Amino acid sequence: MSACLGFRELGLQPYEPVLEAMRRFTEQRSPDSQDEIWLVEHPAVFTQGQAGKAEHLLVPGDIPVVQTDRGGQVTYHGPGQLVAYLLLDVRRLGFGVRELVSRIELALIDLLASYAVQASAKPDAPGVYVDGAKIASLGLRIRNGRSFHGLALNVDMDLAPFRRINPCGYAGLAMTQLRDLAGPIELDEVRTRLRGQLVKHLDYAEQTTLTGGID
């Protein structure tokens, strides 16, 4: 079991500065650096993964598109979606990439179960699904045994922009969110529950809230 997982709660932040800060943190961390998870919401943005194909961007319109270095295809971020960036020393944790993805998916499945929502993962399509509709997306990058990027959970947001793309490269993939399945929901409460599930499933002994910026 690893020691302590640090969380930074960043609120609503533009995507690109957070992306640059993630890269910088990953490049500069030492073997003794504490693992961190950054919890954030983003203004409306489409992000294109390393394998992303232009044909999956149907009509982006006025929503900006940012090319990233995470795995996967195109997805959408917007207010009311809870994003968690996992800045972990995966080698130190002793996880393979597939195990890390599975642990993240199980954390999300247990979080949703706490709201009486039955969800599942798919072996051939990372993420978490409810009755075939996607409620959470995953996209990671591992560099020198350290992870960055992470997950996006649809909580209480406008899902319409997903219709401007083929989400995660799948034409016609239905998207859903927690509000539509469990009724009115407080994002702060979901954030707290997600923290607990990630600590549990990633096998940390405890968690702490980190203060200060990410510049």
Swiss-Prot record:
Purpose of the protein: Catalyzes the transfer of endogenously produced octanoic acid from octanoyl-acyl-carrier-protein onto the lipoyl domains of lipoate-dependent enzymes. Lipoyl-ACP can also act as a substrate although octanoyl-ACP is likely to be the physiological substrate.
Pathway entry: Protein modification; protein lipoylation via endogenous pathway; protein N(6)-(lipoyl)lysine from octanoyl-[acyl-carrier-protein]: step 1/2
Q: Which CDD domains does the entry mention? A: LipB
Recorded GO molecular functions are: lipoyl(octanoyl) transferase activity
Marked site: Lowers pKa of active site Cys = K134
Question: Its domain of life?
Answer: Bacteria
Give the similarity note: Belongs to the LipB family.
Which positions are annotated as binding substrate? R70, G71, G72, Q73, V74, T75, Y76, H77, S137, L138, G139, G150, L151, A152
- Report the SUPFAM superfamilies cross-referenced here: Class II aaRS and biotin synthetases
Q: What else is known?
A: In the reaction, the free carboxyl group of octanoic acid is attached via an amide linkage to the epsilon-amino group of a specific lysine residue of lipoyl domains of lipoate-dependent enzymes.
Where does this protein reside within or beyond the cell? Answer: Cytoplasm
The active site of this protein is located at: C168 (acyl-thioester intermediate)
Name this protein carries in UniProt: Octanoyltransferase
Keywords (alphabetical) are:
Acyltransferase, Cytoplasm, Transferase
Alphabetical list of InterPro entries matching this protein: aa-tRNA-synth_II/BPL/LPL, BPL_LPL_catalytic, Octanoyltransferase, Octanoyltransferase_CS
